A protein has these predicted regions:
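Polar low-complexity intrinsically disordered regions
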Residues: 2-155
Length: 155
C-alpha cells in the first residue's frame, strides 16, 4: 500500500472502528429486542437473522460514513477515508445523486442503467463510480453468531 499523501494526512482519523465488532453489537441489540418481544431468548437464531436481513445495509451505510470521513472503518481501504471531502467529486451534482442510489442499496449496474436512461454524461458517471469503488466495500460478516464475544447488547 502506498504512503498517505499530504491531503490524506490532513484528515487522518483520530479513531478507527471495526465493522465486525460494531456489527456484532448491533446483532446482539437486535437479538435482545426480538427476544423481549418473543418473551424468551431467541439466541443464535436472532443473530443469524440480523446478519441475513441487515448486514449488507449496515456495511453500505458504514462505507458511506467512511467516504464522507465521518468514521474510519478499518476493514475499508484507508485511502478511501474522507475521499468525498478531499476530492472534487462533490462539486458535481451527479455525485450526490449517485450516493443517494447507493443509499438505496443500488449497485453500479443500476446506476449505469439509470444514467443511460436519463441521458447523463457517461464519462462523468464512470469517473465517479470508479473513484467511489463500491465493489471494494464488500465485506463479509466474520463474527460467529454461536460464540458472541459480548454477553450483553448494552454499552
Amino acid at each position: 500500500m502506498s504512503p498517505l499523501s499530504p491531503a490524506e494526512v490532513q484528515i487522518e482519523p483520530k479513531v478507527r472502528s471495526s465493522l465486525q465488532e460494531r456489527g456484532e453489537l448491533e446483532a446482539l441489540r437486535f437479538k435482545w429486542i426480538e427476544s423481549e418481544k418473543a418473551g424468551y431468548d431467541l439466541g443464535e437464531m436472532a443473530v443469524r437473522q440480523w446478519i441475513g436481513r441487515y448486514w449488507q445495509r449496515f456495511i453500505r451505510q458504514k462505507w458511506l460514513e467512511h467516504l464522507y470521513g465521518e468514521t474510519c472503518w478499518v476493514e475499508f481501504d484507508p485511502r478511501a477515508f474522507g475521499i468525498l471531502r478531499r476530492s472534487h467529486l462533490l462539486e458535481s451534482p451527479l455525485t450526490e445523486t449517485i450516493l443517494e442510489h447507493f443509499r438505496w442499496g443500488e449497485e453500479n449496474l443500476h446506476i449505469i442503467q439509470w444514467a443511460m436512461d436519463a441521458g447523463q454524461p457517461m464519462d462523468e458517471i464512470r469517473v465517479i463510480l470508479t473513484t467511489l469503488d463500491v465493489n471494494s466495500s464488500r465485506v463479509p460478516c466474520q463474527f460467529d453468531p454461536a460464540r458472541p464475544r459480548y454477553r450483553t447488547a448494552a454499552g
